[in-house]
């Protein structure tokens, strides 16, 4: 019997180890990781092509940072929920991310349980809304 997929996800982080860790966490909980990117420009391309349910988006990346990419992702894939994942959790960054349309923020270093709890909360809120 096939497992029920909870959501499709694109993982965006310039650190390949972080992407691998996030993919392991997500796949272990029946999320389908359909794409990944190492910078904001590639993230936009992935989101436009794949229209994921959820995007895990780092802030500090080369070529285009996550805050710039966030606005473009909402243009090319307006139904995608974006959860920011960053070590840069100053109040200014969090406020800017939320203002630009992020649904939440998870601070690095990551704990699997906190990432999954935040994702589940966001997805449940989307279903109710």
Roles of regions detected by a PLM:
Residues 16-35:
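Two-component/phosphorelay signaling modules centered on CheY-like receiver
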Residues 39-42, 65-68:
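Acidic catalytic/metal-coordinating carboxylates
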Residues 50-56:
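Active-site beta3 strand of CheY-like receiver
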Residues 61:
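Receiver (REC) domain active-site loop signature in two-component systems and cognate sites
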Residues 88-89:
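Short, conserved "switch-loop" micro-motifs in signal-transduction and mechanochemical regulators
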Residues 92, 110-120:
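C-terminal output helix
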């Amino acid at each position: 019997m096939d497992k029920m997929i909870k959501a499709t996800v694109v993982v965006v982080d310039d650190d390949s180890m972080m992407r691998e860790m996030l993919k392991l966490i997500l796949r272990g909980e029946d999320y389908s990781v359909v794409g990944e990117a190492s910078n904001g420009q590639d993230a936009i391309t992935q989101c436009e092509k794949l229209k994921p349910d959820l995007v895990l988006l780092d802030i500090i990346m080369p070529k285009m940072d996550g805050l710039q990419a966030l606005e473009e992702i909402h243009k090319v894939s307006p139904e995608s929920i974006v959860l920011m994942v960053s070590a840069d959790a100053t109040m200014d960054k969090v406020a800017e991310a939320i203002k630009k349309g992020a649904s939440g923020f998870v601070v690095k270093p990551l704990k699997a349980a906190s990432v999954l709890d935040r994702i589940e909360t966001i997805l449940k809120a989307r279903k109710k809304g």
